[in-house]
């Protein structure tokens, strides 16, 4: 069976944890930050986990991570 290619955009956006969960960055923190509260910006610094519904799809995109 041939090697699988890793999806380049996905390998930059997702990280697989030691337990197998997929971590992603939070949206809402790229531009127009002056109008957002300090609390909101601080909250979105942390990552979030991918939902169970999308996890299988993303694992196919990054097979070797």
Swiss-Prot record:
Gene Ontology molecular function: any one: structural constituent of ribosome
Matching PROSITE patterns: RIBOSOMAL_L35
Coiled coil: none
Recorded GO CC terms: cytosolic large ribosomal subunit
Keywords: Ribonucleoprotein, Ribosomal protein
Any one Gene Ontology BP term: translation
Disulphide bond pairs: none
Family under the similarity heading: Belongs to the bacterial ribosomal protein bL35 family.
Designated name of the protein: Large ribosomal subunit protein bL35
Source organism of this protein record: Ruminiclostridium cellulolyticum (strain ATCC 35319 / DSM 5812 / JCM 6584 / H10)
Lineage: Bacteria, Bacillati, Bacillota, Clostridia, Eubacteriales
């Amino acid at each position: 069976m041939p090697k699988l290619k890793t999806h380049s955009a996905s390998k930059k956006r997702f990280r697989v944890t030691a337990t197998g969960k997929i971590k992603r960055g939070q949206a809402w923190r790229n531009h127009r930050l002056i109008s957002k509260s300090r609390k909101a910006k601080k909250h979105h610094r942390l990552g979030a986990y991918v939902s169970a519904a999308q996890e299988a799809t993303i694992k196919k995109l990054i097979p070797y991570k």
